[in-house]
Amino acid sequence: MFSRLTFFFIAGTLLCCQLSKTENALTGPEIVSPGEVGLIADSLDLIRDHIQWAIDSQYIAGGVALVARDGKIAWYEAVGFSDRVKQDSLRKDDIFRIASMTKPITTTAIMQLFEQGKLDTSDPVSKYIPEFANSLVVDSFNEADSSYTTRPASRAVTIHDLLTHTSGLTYSYPGSKSGIIYSKFGVIEGWTKDSVLLADNVRIFARLPLMHDPGVQFTYGTSVDVLGRVVEVVSGQPLDAYIEEHILSPLEMVDTYFYLPAEKYDRLVDVWYTADANPEVYHDDYAVSGAKMYFAGGAGLNSTAMDYFKFANALMMGGIRDNTRILKEETVASMTSNHLDTLHLSDGEQFGYGFSVYTADGSFGRKMGRYSWGGFWQTIFWVDPSRNIVALLMTNARETPKWNELFDGYERIVNQSVKE
């Protein structure tokens, strides 16, 4: 369990072990030649070929890639189509559904409230959402008839558990135990066009049986949607209003929304579905149609490559952009350190607050300290503090059979472009 004192002790220790970023953050996104920031132009140009390979292979319709070093953009291009059927060319300022790349933004909102002393990561969630008191855990599950039994959880779910995806909440993966059980409750995961409030849906989350006791296992899922409701309760603002006032506006993220204004509808890219996908199950027009009243802290935002770069670069700079601070430097340091203790994701890769973090060097040229996250619609970003690199790749596609090859290959190209 992480108290405020423990949190800042860890953060302070981390800061002593790494170079401190200055507060002279980026004044507007400056675009430079790759060589000016120690990157090899010919190597970065392979990004274009890599994205084109994915387009030619029918995996995606197009992509916008952005690579920056030292806060300066060295490669920024759109390749392919925003609508492949209509053959509309993709533009750099087109808007993408970013799904789970919403999670780091909602986590940032939580940590702002933490800094203000309005909540603590060790607090039980029931302090803010009473329905989370006396949580139950699945004890047994009968695959034959989908019946299950429960028992009391070993302890209360905390804010820390939600931040680290160790709460026991998950997603209803098709055919899984969670998928079968969750279907009995009618819970909304991600986005919806229905007239539903976050507060009401989170009450259903609170009734769901946990898949395991809090804190004993990393189980990716809807924890950050619950955190979105905590933001609302603590701040007294709807989640969209809080994020706009305290994150998007200070960072001048002018094209990031839960629901797009009408004048920007034409900039939302079309989702490319491969032959194995069923578009009807995804309701991908949620950003421009429906009730527009559900603010999913774990999956609901839409953004551009440039906007998200502003957010990611502010993190790399220690929580600041243009002398506007959204987080303390020590808070960012702790958020991007491992918080899983003895739990383990994979060799070198662990989880902080809102990000996967590398505690050792990894494949594809990844360095210790790298942190990142991606989204359901095939988007990804990462920050490499050891090289001062921020990179993003935005696409919107589903059932892409080689999405790992797309993203990993992109990262390898970026890392190989660094002049040693």
Regions found by a protein language model. Give the residues of each.
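C-terminal motif of bacterial Sec signal peptides marking the signal peptidase cleavage site
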Residues: 15-16
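Short, gly/Ser/Thr-rich active-site loops of penicillin-recognizing serine hydrolases
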Residues: 19, 317, 321, 331, ...
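Sec-dependent signal peptide recognition
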Residues: 2-8
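Active-site SXXK
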Residues: 51, 71, 96-129, 133-134, ...
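Short, conserved catalytic-motif segment at the N-terminal edge
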Residues: 35-98, 118-120, 137-142, 284-286, ...
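Acidic/histidine-rich, surface-exposed loop or edge segments in extracytoplasmic proteins
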Residues: 25-35
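Structured C-terminal helix/loop/strand segments within mature extracytoplasmic catalytic/sensor domains
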Residues: 374-420
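Short, surface-exposed loop or secondary-structure junction motifs
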Residues: 135-368
